[in-house]
Curated annotation (Swiss-Prot):
Annotated catalysed reactions: L-seryl-[protein] + ATP = O-phospho-L-seryl-[protein] + ADP + H(+); L-threonyl-[protein] + ATP = O-phospho-L-threonyl-[protein] + ADP + H(+)
Keyword Transferase tagged: yes
The encoding gene: BUD32
Gene3D superfamilies: Phosphorylase Kinase, domain 1, Transferase(Phosphotransferase) domain 1
Region (Disordered): 134-158
Protein name stated in the entry: EKC/KEOPS complex subunit BUD32
Binding residues for ATP: I14, K15, Q16, G17, A18, E19, A20, K21, V22, K54
PROSITE patterns: PROTEIN_KINASE_DOM, PROTEIN_KINASE_TYR
GO biological process, one term: tRNA processing
One cellular component (GO) term of this entry: EKC/KEOPS complex
């Protein structure tokens, strides 16, 4: 029996995608209880830390050897990418468990709201861990739909109200996103699935600021080799904004502005050129189908 089996059996399945199942647990291990001899009283240790377990289950359509290899490679890189990002000052979930053989990675559960929810994109749907090309196609198709459909402004989300009560504007939020992405790309890691669903806003009472941006779900992350790799990461986010948040051009412009400042002109210039190329290819693809 794999070491992760008891953990998965204790967890509650909260999301399922094409590549992984996500479970929630109140803590990684059962909360210990201390009993005093000669007394019926007892007390528990400090409050447990809620965790998320992501299980990359076996793909029966793949050869077992290939499946085990790919699962191990992706899981290992995800764990290393999270550790490297955290070391560079990017706020990401803490990794608390890695079972390479079973394909399970455990992380702290982030309490807060996704940027998607805050900007009125609705509740989160299924999490699907899919290939980067499929992500781009799906995002682009949704973007086409939103371009021809005007959506009415909905009520303010709970997260947006909480930020407003702290004096935080949407513009400030966009700048924080841009700064977080710049820190990530400085590590030469690309996220691979940059959407507003994969960015959490966590309030930080007593911290240096009222909130922080937490980047989550590094299942498609990879090592960047060329400026175009960063440009594609940014383009996926741009199309996600257009798809989920109508009239978001100004918001995304704030993300890019702060991102460029964070990277510095020398590194930003080649990425900016490639981003324009990627946009042109995307528009051509939209027109030709």
């Amino acid at each position: 029996m794999a070491a992760s089996t008891p953990l998965l059996s204790r967890g509650t399945l909260i999301k399922q995608g094409a590549e992984a199942k996500v479970y929630a647990l109140p803590s990684l291990f059962p909360e210990p209880t201390t009993y005093h001899p000669g007394s019926s009283s007892s007390f528990s240790a400090a409050s447990p830390t809620p965790v998320i377990l992501k299980h990359r289950f076996t793909k029966t359509y793949r050869h077992p050897t290939l499946d085990a290899y790919l699962t191990s490679q992706r899981l290992t890189f995800e764990a290393r990418a999270l550790a490297r990002a955290a070391k560079a000052g990017v706020t990401v979930p803490k990794v608390v468990w890695v079972d390479e053989k079973a394909g399970v990675i455990g992380m702290e559960r982030i309490e807060g709201w996704s940027v998607r929810e805050i900007l009125g994109g609705g509740a989160e749907g299924e999490v699907e861990v899919i290939e980067e090309q499929e992500i781009e196609e799906d995002v682009e198709n949704k973007a086409e739909d939103s371009a021809v459909r005007e959506e009415p402004e909905g009520p303010e989300s709970e997260g947006l109200k909480a930020l407003k009560n702290l004096g935080v504007t949407q513009e400030h939020l966009m700048r924080s996103i841009g700064a977080a992405l710049a820190r990530l790309h400085k590590t030469m890691i690309i996220h691979g699935d940059l959407t507003t669903s994969n960015m959490m806003v966590r309030l930080t009472p007593g911290g240096s600021g009222p909130y922080e941006i937490v980047l989550i779900d590094f299942g498609l992350s990879s090592q960047a080799q060329f400026p175009e790799n960063y440009a594609v990461d940014l383009y996926v986010l741009e199309r996600a904004f257009a798809s989920t948040h109508p009239r978001s051009e100004k918001l995304y412009a704030g993300v890019l502005e702060t991102y460029a400042e964070g990277l510095g002109e020398k590194k930003w210039k080649p990425i900016q050129i490639k981003l324009k190329d990627v946009r042109r290819r995307g528009r051509k693809r939209d027109m030709t189908g």
